[in-house]
C-alpha cells in the first residue's frame, strides 16, 4: 500500500483539528485530519491523510519546523498490523537495547542476592554445627549426672512420656529411698484426687484432639488465658523429691491394678471434650440455619430484581405499542408471559440476510475518502482478481460520495483474499475497513408500463417476458455490442425524407439488388453520422474498438426510430440523474447520452436497457472511455451555442447533402484544422505528471485551448495506459504559442526540466498518436492465423460472417463502388453451399483500404460484415523457387 498517511508529534495543546488540517493543505488534498485525544485533552500527536502519495512525501518536509512555539516531528505513519514495524526503543519493550541492559542488571542483582542467601545459610549452618558440638559435649558431661536426669524426667510433659519408660529407674530409686516412703504415699493420694502437690491448682483438658493436660488455678476464670501459661512453681526442697517420685510410682501401680474397672480408669482421663463438641455442633447448626436464611433472602432479592426488569420491559413494550397505534388487545397476555420468561436481547440473524463472502463474492468497504472514484478502487482491488462491479453510493442532494463502496468480484475466492489483505490498510490517507457485503438487491425499476403494453397487443406472454428479463440481465455483456448499429427502417425513413421520396420508391422491390442497395444506404448514413460525431468532438476511432476500456458515464443509444427528438431522449434519461449533454445524429439513428455522475448512469443503463421506446426496444451500450475530446460545456454556454447553430443550420444542411451524394465512393475524412491553430510540443515530462498538472501550468497563458499527454498501451495490461514522456499544447493563435515557448521553455514541472518547441506535424489530436501505438482491431484478430504477427495491408480482403443467401454477383456489386475489383472468390462446401466467408481482391491497396473503412460497420442481409486484410498470393517466381527447394530435398533424400 502507498504511504499516504503521516504522523505528527509534539503538537501544541491548544491546536484544533481545523487549524491542524489547514497547516498541511498546501501540500495537497487532505482526506483526514485527526488529533488524538483522551478524556477531551490532546495527547500532543495526530495523523494527516492525503489523497496521493506524492503529497504525503512533500509534507514530510515540515519535520523539525514549528507550530507556534512547538517543534513538531513529522514522519510516515505505519499500520499496527504491518509486519515492518520500527525498532523498539522503550526499556519495557523486548528487543530494545535499554530493555537488554535492564534485564542484564536484574540478572546480576539476582545472582548477588542468591550468593548472599547462600553465604547466610552457610553461616547459620556453621553456627548450628558449633552449637551442636558444644551441646554434645555438655550432654556427654551431664549424661552421668543423676540429678540432671531426674530434672529432665520431671520437666518433661506427661504426653511425651511413656508409662513404662522409667519403671526400672523408679523402682531402683524406691529401694534406695525407703526412708522417705511415707511422704510418697501422701503425694500419691494427692495425685489420685487429680491435683498436683502444690495447692490451689487443678488439672483440666481443653484440647480434645491432642489430649494435653494444662494447669489452671482453682480461683482463676476460665477465660483468663494468661493463667494458662503461668510459670511453673518453684520446686520443693530436696527432702520432698523422694516423696514426689514415690507418689508417681504409686499412681502407676494403681493404674495397673486389676481390681480397678476399665470405666473407672478411663473416667480419670475424661475432659471437657464432650462439652466443647456440643458447643461446636450448636455453632454449626446455627451457621447452617443462618446460611439458609441468607440464601432465601438472596433468592427473594433476585426475584425482586427480575420483576423490576420485567416491569421495565413491559413499560417499553407498551410505549412501542402506543407509538405504532396497534389495535391488538393481547398486550396483557404478553405482559404476564414476560414476567415469567427471561429477558430477551435483540440478535441480528446474519444467516438469513448476509451471505458468506465466499459465496456472494461481494465486499463492503467503508471509511473511504469522499473524493474516491471507481477508478481508484479498481486500481487497488483489481490485483486480487477480475472485478464485475464497483458501486459507490452517493448523496443525491450533494452528488457526493458517502464514504462507502461495494465491490463485486467475478470469482468469490478473490473477494475472500481482498477481505483478508485490505482490511485495516491505508488508502488515500484513511484506514479503510473491509467487511463481507450483502448480495445486491434484486429489484428493478419499472417505467413506461404503458409503452410496454403497446409493444405486444393483449399483453406479453410468459415466454416473451422471460426473454425480455434475460436480455436485461445480459445487457452489460459486450458479446453482442455493435457501436454503430442502426435500424434499417430508420435509415430508409431518413433517406426518404431527405430526398423527398417514399420508402417504396427508394427501395424499388422490383429490382434484384435490394440487399446491396440497403447495405450501401446504411454505409452512407454511417459515414454521415461519423462526420457529425467528429464535429461534436467525438473520437470516432474509439467507438468501433471493442477492446477499449468503457466509460462509466457515457451511453450509446441505438435502435431508436426516425421520429425520435432530442428533448424526448433528454426527458427519458433525466429521470435517473442529471445529464451533461445529449448528442443525436442528423439521421436520428444513434445518440450519445452523458451523465454527470457514474451512479446515475448505471441506474439509467439498468432500467432502460431493452425497454420500449415508442414501439421499439432501446439498445444501450457503454461508450469507450475518453470518447469526447473536451468536457461538456456549462449550461450558459450551451444556450449561446444553440442560437449560433440555428443561424448556421441551413449551411450545415447543404454541406450534408453534398457529402452524402459521394459517400459511397469516398471514405471518412479527418477534421480539418484551423489555419490559426498552433500546437507546441513538450518533451522530457515526468512519468508521474498528469494532464491536470499541465493545465494548471499553462492555462494562464494567452490563447490557451487545451493540453494532452501522449500515452501508450501497457504490454502487460492492455487496458492500462502509460505516459510517453511528451505531449502537445494547443493554442488558438501563433502568438500564444510563441509566447508560451518564450516564457516557459526550460522551466521545471515535477522536478523535470521541460523543453518546448513548435510541433512539426501540427497534430490536432493526441489520441491519434496514441492510436498509432496500438494494434488495429482487425490486425489483432488475425495475429494467431499469421504466425503471431499482425496482417499487413494488402489489396486482398477476407470477408467473414457472410450470409448464406449472398452470391458472388451481389458481393461484386457491393464492393465495386469502392474500387476496381480484380477477383471475387467464395469457397464452397461439397453439398454446393458456400462456407460463410469469401475473398475480394482489388487492384490497389488504397482501394482495399477505402472498402474496409466504409463497410467495416455495415450489415448485409442483416449480418455484420467482418473485414480483414488477407495474405497476398505469391507470384510465379516465388512458387518456382519453392518448387526447386522441394525438389532438391527429395533428390538428396535416400530411400
From Swiss-Prot:
Residues 317-326 have a biased composition (Basic residues). GO terms for cellular component: nucleolus; nucleus. One of its GO terms (biological process) is rRNA processing. Pfam families: RRM_1. Residues 778-794 have a biased composition (Polar residues). CDD domains: RRM1_MRD1 (cd12565), RRM2_MRD1 (cd12566), RRM4_RBM19_RRM3_MRD1 (cd12317), RRM6_RBM19_RRM5_MRD1 (cd12320). It comes from the Eukaryota. It is found in: Nucleus. Residues 96-134, 284-331 form a coiled coil. Residues 84-136, 172-200, 223-340, 442-479, 634-670, 769-796 are annotated as: Disordered. InterPro entries: Nucleotide-bd_a/b_plait_sf, RBD_domain_sf, RBM, RRM_dom, RRM_dom_euk. Keywords: Coiled coil, Nucleus, Repeat, RNA-binding. Residues 451-462, 659-670 have a biased composition (Low complexity). Residues 101-113, 241-251, 265-278, 296-316, 635-658 have a biased composition (Basic and acidic residues). Residues 179-191 have a biased composition (Acidic residues). The keyword RNA-binding applies. GO terms for molecular function: mRNA binding; rRNA binding. The keyword Cytoplasm does not apply. Residues 4-79, 361-439, 553-625, 678-761, 795-872 form the RRM domain. SUPFAM superfamilies: RNA-binding domain, RBD (SSF54928). Belongs to the RRM MRD1 family. This is Multiple RNA-binding domain-containing protein 1. The gene is mrd1.
Amino acid at each position: 500500500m502507498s504511504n499516504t498517511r503521516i504522523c505528527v508529534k509534539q503538537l501544541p495543546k491548544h491546536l484544533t483539528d481545523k487549524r491542524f488540517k489547514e497547516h498541511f493543505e498546501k501540500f495537497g488534498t487532505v482526506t483526514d485530519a485527526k488529533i488524538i485525544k483522551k478524556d477531551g485533552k490532546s495527547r500532543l500527536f495526530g495523523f494527516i491523510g492525503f489523497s496521493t502519495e506524492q503529497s504525503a512525501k512533500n509534507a514530510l518536509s515540515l519535520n523539525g519546523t514549528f507550530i507556534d512555539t512547538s517543534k513538531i516531528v513529522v514522519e510516515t505513519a505505519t499500520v499496527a498490523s504491518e509486519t515492518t514495524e520500527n525498532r523498539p526503543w522503550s526499556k519495557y519493550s523486548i528487543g530494545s537495547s535499554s530493555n537488554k541492559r535492564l534485564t542484564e542488571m536484574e540478572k546480576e542483582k539476582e545472582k548477588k542476592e542468591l550468593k548472599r542467601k547462600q553465604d547466610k545459610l552457610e553461616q547459620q549452618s556453621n553456627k548450628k554445627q558449633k552449637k551442636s558440638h558444644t551441646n554434645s559435649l555438655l550432654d556427654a558431661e551431664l549424661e552421668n549426672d543423676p540429678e540432671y536426669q531426674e530434672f529432665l524426667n520431671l520437666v518433661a510433659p506427661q504426653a511425651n512420656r511413656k508409662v513404662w519408660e522409667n519403671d526400672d529407674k523408679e523402682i531402683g530409686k524406691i529401694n534406695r529411698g525407703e526412708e522417705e516412703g511415707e511422704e510418697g504415699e501422701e503425694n500419691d493420694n494427692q495425685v489420685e484426687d487429680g491435683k498436683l502437690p502444690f495447692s490451689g491448682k487443678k488439672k483440666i483438658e481443653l484440647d480434645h484432639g491432642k489430649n494435653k493436660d494444662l494447669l489452671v488455678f482453682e480461683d482463676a476464670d476460665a477465660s483468663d488465658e494468661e493463667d494458662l501459661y503461668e510459670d511453673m512453681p518453684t520446686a520443693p526442697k530436696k527432702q520432698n523429691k523422694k516423696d514426689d517420685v514415690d507418689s508417681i510410682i504409686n499412681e502407676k501401680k494403681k493404674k495397673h491394678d486389676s481390681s480397678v474397672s476399665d470405666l473407672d480408669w478411663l473416667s480419670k482421663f475424661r475432659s471437657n471434650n464432650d462439652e466443647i463438641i456440643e458447643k461446636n455442633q450448636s455453632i454449626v447448626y446455627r451457621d447452617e440455619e443462618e446460611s439458609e436464611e441468607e440464601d432465601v433472602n438472596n433468592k427473594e432479592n433476585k426475584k425482586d430484581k427480575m420483576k423490576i426488569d420485567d416491569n421495565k420491559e413491559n413499560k417499553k413494550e407498551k410505549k412501542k405499542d402506543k407509538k405504532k397505534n396497534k389495535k391488538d388487545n393481547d398486550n396483557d397476555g404478553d405482559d404476564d408471559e414476560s414476567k415469567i420468561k427471561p429477558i430477551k436481547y435483540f440478535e441480528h440473524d446474519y444467516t438469513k440476510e448476509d451471505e458468506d463472502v465466499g459465496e456472494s463474492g461481494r465486499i463492503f468497504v467503508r471509511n473511504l475518502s469522499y473524493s474516491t472514484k471507481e477508478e481508484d478502487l479498481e486500481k487497488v482491488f483489481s490485483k486480487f482478481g477480475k472485478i464485475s462491479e464497483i458501486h459507490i453510493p452517493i448523496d443525491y442532494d450533494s452528488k457526493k460520495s458517502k464514504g462507502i463502496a461495494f465491490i463485486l468480484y467475478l470469482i468469490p475466492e478473490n473477494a475472500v483474499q481482498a477481505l483478508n489483505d485490505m482490511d485495516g490498510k491505508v488508502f488515500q490517507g484513511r484506514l479503510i475497513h473491509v467487511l463481507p457485503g450483502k448480495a445486491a438487491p434484486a429489484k428493478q425499476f419499472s417505467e413506461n408500463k404503458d409503452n410496454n403494453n403497446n409493444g405486444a397487443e393483449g399483453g406479453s406472454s410468459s415466454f416473451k417476458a422471460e426473454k425480455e428479463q434475460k436480455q436485461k440481465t445480459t445487457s452489460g455483456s459486450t458479446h453482442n455490442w455493435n457501436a454503430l448499429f442502426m435500424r434499417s427502417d430508420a435509415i430508409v425513413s431518413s433517406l426518404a425524407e431527405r430526398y423527398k421520396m417514399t420508402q417504396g420508391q427508394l427501395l424499388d422491390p422490383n429490382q434484384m439488388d435490394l440487399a446491396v442497395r440497403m447495405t450501401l444506404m446504411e454505409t452512407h448514413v454511417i459515414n454521415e453520422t461519423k462526420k457529425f460525431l467528429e464535429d461534436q468532438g467525438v473520437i470516432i476511432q474509439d467507438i468501433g474498438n471493442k477492446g477499449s476500456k468503457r466509460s462509466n458515464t457515457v451511453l450509446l443509444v441505438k435502435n431508436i426510430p426516425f421520429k425520435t427528438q432530442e428533448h424526448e431522449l433528454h426527458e427519458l434519461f433525466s429521470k435517473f440523474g442529471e445529464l451533461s449533454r445529449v448528442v443525436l445524429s442528423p439521421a436520428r439513428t444513434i445518440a450519445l447520452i452523458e451523465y454527470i455522475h457514474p451512479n446515475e448512469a448505471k441506474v439509467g443503463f439498468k432500467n432502460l436497457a431493452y425497454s420500449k421506446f415508442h414501439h421499439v426496444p432501446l439498445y444501450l451500450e457503454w461508450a469507450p472511455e475518453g470518447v469526447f475530446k473536451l468536457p461538456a460545456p456549462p449550461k450558459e454556454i450551451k444556450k449561446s451555442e444553440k442560437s449560433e447553430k440555428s443561424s448556421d443550420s441551413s449551411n450545415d444542411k447543404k454541406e450534408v447533402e453534398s457529402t452524402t451524394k459521394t459517400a459511397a465512393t469516398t471514405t471518412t475524412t479527418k477534421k480539418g484544422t484551423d489555419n490559426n491553430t498552433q500546437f507546441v510540443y513538450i518533451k522530457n515530462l515526468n512519468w508521474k505528471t498528469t494532464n491536470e498538472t499541465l493545465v494548471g501550468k499553462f492555462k494562464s497563458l494567452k490563447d490557451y485551448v487545451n493540453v494532452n499527454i501522449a500515452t501508450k498501451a501497457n504490454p502487460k495490461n492492455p487496458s492500462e495506459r502509460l505516459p510517453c514522456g511528451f505531449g502537445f499544447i494547443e493554442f488558438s493563435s501563433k502568438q500564444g504559442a510563441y509566447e508560451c515557448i518564450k516564457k516557459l521553455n526550460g522551466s521545471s514541472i515535477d522536478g523535470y526540466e521541460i523543453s518546448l518547441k513548435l510541433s512539426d506535424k501540427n497534430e490536432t489530436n493526441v489520441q491519434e498518436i496514441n492510436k498509432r501505438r496500438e494494434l488495429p482491431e482487425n490486425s489483432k484478430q488475425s495475429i494467431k492465423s499469421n504466425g503471431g504477427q499482425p496482417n499487413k495491408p494488402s489489396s486482398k480482403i477476407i470477408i467473414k460472417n457472410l450470409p448464406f443467401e449472398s452470391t458472388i454477383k451481389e458481393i461484386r456489386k457491393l464492393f465495386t463502388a469502392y474500387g476496381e475489383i480484380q477477383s471475387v472468390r467464395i469457397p464452397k462446401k461439397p453439398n454446393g453451399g458456400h462456407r460463410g466467408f469469401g475473398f475480394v481482391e482489388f487492384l490497389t491497396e488504397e482501394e482495399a483500404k477505402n472498402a474496409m473503412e466504409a463497410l467495416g460497420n455495415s450489415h448485409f442481409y442483416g449480418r455484420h460484415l467482418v473485414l480483414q486484410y488477407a495474405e497476398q498470393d505469391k507470384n510465379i517466381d516465388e512458387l518456382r523457387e519453392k518448387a526447386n527447394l522441394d525438389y532438391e530435398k527429395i533428390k538428396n533424400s535416400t530411400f
